[in-house]
Structures are given as C-alpha cells and as structure tokens.
Amino acid sequence: MDLWTAAQALILGVVEGLTEFLPISSTGHQIIVADLIDFGGERAMAFNIIIQLGAILAVVWEFRRKILDVVVGLPKQQQAQRFTLNLLIAFMPAVVLGVIFADTIHHYLFNAITVATALVIGGVIMLWAERREHTVRTETVDDMSWSDALKIGLVQCLAMIPGTSRSGSTIIGGLLFGLSRKAATEFSFFLAMPTMVGAAVYSGYKYRDMFRPDDFAVFAIGFVTSFIFAMIAVRGLLKFIATHSYAVFAWYRIAFGLLILATWQFGWIDWASAKA
C-alpha cells in the first residue's frame, strides 16, 4: 500500500463518517469525492461496504444502552416489543424495493449530475418542511405507532436515489408525520442499523470476490476513520438539533449541488461520466 492509497482511504473514511448520519447524502459525497481523487473500480466497491460498517458501529456504540435495554426487555416488555416491531416495519420497504431496483438505480443514477440535482431538490424540500408549522404528536421513539414506522420506511426508499440522503428523508419524513425533532432523528439512527447492515451483507455477498487479503490495510484505515468521524457526527448532530433546525443542512445541500452543476455546465469539470 503506497502513501497515496492510504490517503485516499483516509479521505473517504472521513467523508463517510461525517456525512452518513447528516442529512446531506453520504452516497452523493462519496461519488463526488471518489471521482475527484480517482478512487474507483472493484476495490472501491468492497471499500465502500467496509466504511459503511465502520459508521454503523459508531451508532451501535452510541446507542448501546438503548439497544441493550431493548434486547433484555424483548421477551416480556411491551415497549421493547413495539419498538422492535416498528423497526422491522420501517425496514421492510427498503428490503423489497432494494432487491428489485438496486442494480438498475446504480447503473443509471450513480453519477455526479444526479447527485447534484437530488441535493438541490432535497434541500428545497427540507427548507419547506422546516418552515411548516409542526404539530408534534409523538415525543419519543417509544411512542411511535406502526403506521408512523411504515410511512418513514416508505420515505426512506427515496434515498435509493443518490444525493437524496437516507437520514435526510427519514428525519424530514418523521417531522412531517408528527414526530418531535429528537424522535425523528433518533429513529433515523436506529433504522440505519438494520438498513445499512442489510445492504452491506447483500453487497458483501454480491461482491465477495472483490475482497482481497492485500487490501486489508486500506480497509482498516477506512473502517477506523469512518467509525471515529461518524461518532463525532452523531454526537454533534444530537446536540445541534436540540437548539437548531435543519435549515443549515438544507442551504449546504443547495449550495453544494449548484456548485457541482455549475462546474459541469461551464465545462470546468466533466462530471457527466462520473460513476461510483
């Protein structure tokens, strides 16, 4: 492993960790940054799976007490049973639609222009959602109904389009469906666990021949970096949303998306053929 390869792994690990749980699209940022630093091919597919697992481990660690309470209480506690059922209900739409459409979406939509367009549109929707008057019906994740979970699960499927943002769609969807800001954000984190682990297992099996022993060091750098920066991002976001709205992320999405479109329109960078 040369120094540049290590630097690429470090950069992409930081990008994944910082963006996975913020409503700004980690996939979109990975596509853009990977193209800029020329990190692609079979190694990139396997590498992306590894760094996503690093990010997920950060959320598992951050919410380990809640997870342990649910596991211990599952046999007897109705609250734990309802929470688990809601997660399963919210998870299933992504499973069904992911199996059906994942390859087609990856082939046709995983490019920088799609990412930029989705960033802008998602940012506008986020601003609109934040400026609406919210009527909070559900204060905590334990108070959610199965219909809330199903609606959030369906909204999560929009994130199959790169640039949309899984966390952005589920958080904003949760707010529109009457969840408090804290409940919408936390449920988005919990829903990420089965969704991302499921996607990683599916992709890992599909691309199992691309995992090679000589790439271990590259994967390790990406995994550890992603874990550390995802932990920072999760803790930072939970503190931030206690006193702020998501408007700053919406404006960032719009500005970043327009910048990408401008560089393409004026011919400064040829994004048209950029692929994940």
From Swiss-Prot:
Q: Any one Gene Ontology biological process term?
A: response to antibiotic
Entry GO CC: plasma membrane
Q: Where in the cell is it found?
A: Cell inner membrane
Entry EC no(s): 3.6.1.27
UniProt topology in membrane? Multi-pass membrane protein
Chief location bin? membrane
Keywords, alphabetical: Antibiotic resistance, Cell inner membrane, Cell membrane, Cell shape, Cell wall biogenesis/degradation, Hydrolase, Membrane, Peptidoglycan synthesis, Transmembrane, Transmembrane helix
Transmembrane stretches, start-end: 43-63, 85-105, 109-129, 183-203, 218-238, 254-274
What Pfam families does the record point to?
BacA
Task: State whether keyword Transmembrane helix applies.
Answer: yes
- Kindly state which reaction or reactions the protein catalyses: di-trans,octa-cis-undecaprenyl diphosphate + H2O = di-trans,octa-cis-undecaprenyl phosphate + phosphate + H(+)
**What is this enzyme's class at the first EC digit?**
hydrolase
Q: Name one GO molecular function term.
A: undecaprenyl-diphosphatase activity
Indicate the family of this protein.
Belongs to the UppP family.
Query: What does the function comment of this entry state?
Result: Catalyzes the dephosphorylation of undecaprenyl diphosphate (UPP). Confers resistance to bacitracin.
Extra facts:
Bacitracin is thought to be involved in the inhibition of peptidoglycan synthesis by sequestering undecaprenyl diphosphate, thereby reducing the pool of lipid carrier available.
> Mind telling me what this protein is named?
Undecaprenyl-diphosphatase
